[in-house]
Structures are given as structure tokens and as C-alpha cells.
Amino acid sequence: MVTWSDIQRWNPSALTSAGSSLRSLRTTLLTTCQDAEAAERAVLSRGLTVTQAREVLRGLTKKHTRLVNEVSELMMATVEAADGVGDVQTLVLECTQYAQTHPELTLNADGSVDYPKRDVTMGDLTDSRGPSGDACHAALTERDANELKSLVTKALARAVEVDEAYGKRLDALTNGTYTCVETSGTHSPGLPNQPQAGWSPTQVAFWWASLTQAEKQAIITE
């Protein structure tokens, strides 16, 4: 359960750093996979030992292809989460700034909002000259409190969305339900060949930066 006190400490920097490390790992794995494929193609001799060598190389290629796909998925899931955490950080800042600019409101550590309640009489509301100053002030304070509550709710809802989306993708990688049919021979193993609907500019930029020069060229000329 994500709480208000939790998200006040959220910061995307650690996830962004992890995404960059995973990008480097993907490049290394992809190179190893391509080297194994090249080694298999280079074996032209025949015989039992050569056949066994080819089988070993094919096995290594298959394993590295799977690793490339899984690391690519983990990388993009982490970048998506970092983007979401950045959203939450912005929403939390919006809440705290709103509370600071409305000094009658108190934003508590648990995300609840307090404000001074004023006793407003019927006379304050029905005076022939219009509602009294106390009545108007009380109404404005309550309106501001409700606005701050709404901002807190929005921040928490986004935090839950980010947390659940990242957890779902991690679970799929952990329990083996994540599937990817791409191989080292496709344009961008483990990654889509085009930016996906719903991606933020940050995700698109990271996806493009994650591609090797050969992958970029293959996508451009496709």
C-alpha cells in the first residue's frame, strides 16, 4: 500500500541510473549474442565434434537472445517507472506548494488536511446585506481545503498506478510469463522497432539511445 509519507521520498534518480546501467548491459549481451552467431557461421568443417560445437554455439545464442530480451524489458519497465516517479514527485511538490501558499491549511504527515472550522450562524448567511465576512471566509477556506485534498488524492492515485505497473512487469520477468519472440536477427532485439503509443518523450529518447548504430540504421531504412 503506497502512502503519502512514502511518496514524499520518491525520487526518480535511482531508477534513471539503473536504466542507464541496464542499457549498457543490453549492448554487451547483444554483442556477445551476435559474436556467438558469427562463430557458428564461421564453422565450416564437418564431423561429430564440429556438430557438437555448433550445438553449443546455438545454445549460447539462444540463452543470450533470451537475456537480451529480458534485460531490454527490464530496462524499459524501469525507465517507465522512473518517468512515473517523476510525475509523482511533481504532484507532491504541487501539494506542498499549495499548502504553503494557503497558511490556514495544514497538510499532515499522513496526507490528511486540517483547517480551522468557524462557527457560522444562520444570521451570518441570511443577513439582508449578504453573507457575513466570517461566512465567506469559512466557505473559501473549506474550498481551498477540498482542493488540497483533491491534489493529494491525485498524487496518491498516480503513485499507485506507477507502483502497480512496474510490479506487474517485474512479476512477469520473475515468474517466466514474459514472452518476446524477437531474436538477435531482428532490427532491435528485445525492443519494439518503433516508439509505442503512450510513451512519454523521455521514454522515446531512452529507447532511441538504447539502440546500436546498426539497429538505428536498420529502422531508418526499413
List the predicted regions and their residue ranges.
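N-terminal secretion-targeting helices of virulence/extracellular proteins
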Residues: 1-190, 194-206
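Glycosyltransferase catalytic domains, chiefly GT-A lineage
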Residues: 207-211
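Residues that cap or delimit alpha-helices
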Residues: 11, 200, 212-215, 222
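Short, charge- and proline-biased low-complexity linear segments
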Residues: 35, 220-222
